[in-house]
Amino acid sequence: MTAHDADWSDRDVSGALVPGEGDIDVSLRPRSLREFIGQPRVREQLQLVIEGAKNRGGTPDHILLSGPPGLGKTSLAMIIAAELGSSLRVTSGPALERAGDLAAMLSNLVEHDVLFIDEIHRIARPAEEMLYLAMEDFRVDVVVGKGPGATSIPLEVAPFTLVGATTRSGALTGPLRDRFGFTAHMDFYEPAELQQVLARSAGILGIELGAEAAEEIARRSRGTPRIANRLLRRVRDFAEVRADGVITRDVAKAALAVYDVDELGLDRLDRAVLTALTRSFGGGPVGVSTLAVAVGEEAATVEEVCEPFLVRAGMVARTPRGRVATAQAWTHLGMVPPAGAAGLGQPGLFD
């Protein structure tokens, strides 16, 4: 691992799941739709899908959950299985490299099981094509042998519900997307919703969290429950070591300053991207690959981890010619925006 990798690999404000925190995250997961905070529209729709299937005594349509990481897609998959009283089988798109990998998993399903495929947009094409038939007709054709002597053997699959999760719904092929009977897009959380998430998590973890402190952490959590819970744990560490264990607003502010999370929830990598965009490229436009090289990161990391929040926060604008720093980005970095900065003189355009 390089020094640079050490800097960014454990970002507290990344929506990605950090190794070693899985057990804690499991304890904080809601176990029913009633416990799930936020996403009211999605919850209502899922409730109808689940109750309708239970009333008919059948399996629900296949379900696709899309949205940025850390919003609760995996939790909802677990809840769907629990609400149906079914077993949950879990895998991921990258793990299904061959059709045989998927066939083995499908053959072990029993009726009404829920199969959860995370990052389904990354499933290999042979496995995806096998999935088409399994989703529609609950059977798969397994090819035995090679060349002219190859034989296709049909295998029945127990009726099941597929729950797919993706952070890039546009990367799904049309045939796969069309086979989902219900699609839900999950939105970023409002600060008030994140305060509820933090209050619930604090209760489970036995943390004394003041209302003002919860508001402070929620405001810097980038609209993402996973980040809110992660920051809560880091602030707890600070409170136990450098304070009396009680998390007040001042303690939360001091802790978040130590972890380089600023008032808007930006961390060092976010600020590095903005700094490169403004100082090295004069505000842009600049391509994401060039921008990634400037900060020493992979283009995918900049595009999938940093950029969504920076765009949503009104700091970066995506244009046909590349990424452009808005007037708000210049101001946030303590610089005077140039006359041509995006959004300058257009109040509310990026609010």
Curated annotation (Swiss-Prot):
Gene3D superfamilies linked to this entry: 1.10.8.60, P-loop containing nucleotide triphosphate hydrolases, Winged helix-like DNA-binding domain superfamily/Winged helix DNA-binding domain
SUPFAM superfamilies given in the database record: P-loop containing nucleoside triphosphate hydrolases (SSF52540), Winged helix' DNA-binding domain (SSF46785)
Keywords recorded for this protein, A-Z: ATP-binding, Cytoplasm, DNA damage, DNA recombination, DNA repair, DNA-binding, Hydrolase, Nucleotide-binding
Subcellular location field: Cytoplasm
GO biological processes: DNA recombination; DNA repair
Region span, Small ATPAse domain (RuvB-S): 190-260
Cross-referenced InterPro entries: AAA+_ATPase (IPR003593), AAA_lid_4 (IPR041445), DNA_helicase_Holl-junc_RuvB (IPR004605), P-loop_NTPase (IPR027417), RuvB-like_N (IPR008824), RuvB_C (IPR008823), WH-like_DNA-bd_sf (IPR036388), WH_DNA-bd_sf (IPR036390)
Top-level class of the enzyme under EC nomenclature: hydrolase
Record: residues binding ATP: L28, R29, G70, K73, T74, S75, E136, D137, F138, R179, Y189, R226
Region (Large ATPase domain (RuvB-L)) location: 1-189
Pfam families referenced in this protein's UniProt entry, alphabetically: AAA_lid_4, RuvB_C, RuvB_N
Main location: cytoplasm
Highest rank taxon of the organism: Bacteria
Subunit structure as annotated in this protein's UniProt entry: Homohexamer. Forms an RuvA(8)-RuvB(12)-Holliday junction (HJ) complex. HJ DNA is sandwiched between 2 RuvA tetramers; dsDNA enters through RuvA and exits via RuvB. An RuvB hexamer assembles on each DNA strand where it exits the tetramer. Each RuvB hexamer is contacted by two RuvA subunits (via domain III) on 2 adjacent RuvB subunits; this complex drives branch migration. In the full resolvosome a probable DNA-RuvA(4)-RuvB(12)-RuvC(2) complex forms which resolves the HJ.
Domains as described in the record: Has 3 domains, the large (RuvB-L) and small ATPase (RuvB-S) domains and the C-terminal head (RuvB-H) domain. The head domain binds DNA, while the ATPase domains jointly bind ATP, ADP or are empty depending on the state of the subunit in the translocation cycle. During a single DNA translocation step the structure of each domain remains the same, but their relative positions change.
UniProt record similarity statement: Belongs to the RuvB family.
Main function: The RuvA-RuvB-RuvC complex processes Holliday junction (HJ) DNA during genetic recombination and DNA repair, while the RuvA-RuvB complex plays an important role in the rescue of blocked DNA replication forks via replication fork reversal (RFR). RuvA specifically binds to HJ cruciform DNA, conferring on it an open structure. The RuvB hexamer acts as an ATP-dependent pump, pulling dsDNA into and through the RuvAB complex. RuvB forms 2 homohexamers on either side of HJ DNA bound by 1 or 2 RuvA tetramers; 4 subunits per hexamer contact DNA at a time.
Name recorded for this polypeptide: Holliday junction branch migration complex subunit RuvB
Organism this protein belongs to: Mycolicibacterium paratuberculosis (strain ATCC BAA-968 / K-10) (Mycobacterium paratuberculosis)
Upper taxonomic lineage: Bacteria, Bacillati, Actinomycetota, Actinomycetes, Mycobacteriales
